[in-house]
Amino acid sequence: MKKELFQYCDSVLHIRKSRRVRTFEKLLDNYWAFREKNHGTLLFITSDIEETYSTIHKAIVTYMDCMDIMNIRKIPNEIFIDCLIGNQEKILIIIKKDYNLEEVKGMRVDQVFIDCIGDSDININSDIIIHYLLPLTVNNNGKYLDNIILIY
């Protein structure tokens, strides 16, 4: 299933489970370095929302000296993390379960991360990427940022 998605993603990262936190830290750091506005939104699609949340939270708290978590909101199938970089730059990180992805239509995000954890199969196909996820990144916040990144 994951290999079918390769051709629809700008970047594909194959990582060991032990390197997840450092990889997520590097992804957040790259976004921070290459964005063009002082605000932005990142969307993580995953089959295991708690595992992805735990990884992102640990990456921010442990390694991101310049980023602070201001607010965390949890609702069924979604987690919102409001972050502050420096004094005034705001980033919203949305972690969404791979269920009912038609709901994202109309959102605007800078990058979409498809997080395939371990051996779990994610409920995403080429139609969802083309019709729902790719249009979200139309107003991408930086010409050097990839639109869709697959992490497995």
Residue locations for each model-derived region?
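Phosphate/NTP-binding elements of NTP-utilizing enzymes
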Residues: M1-Y152
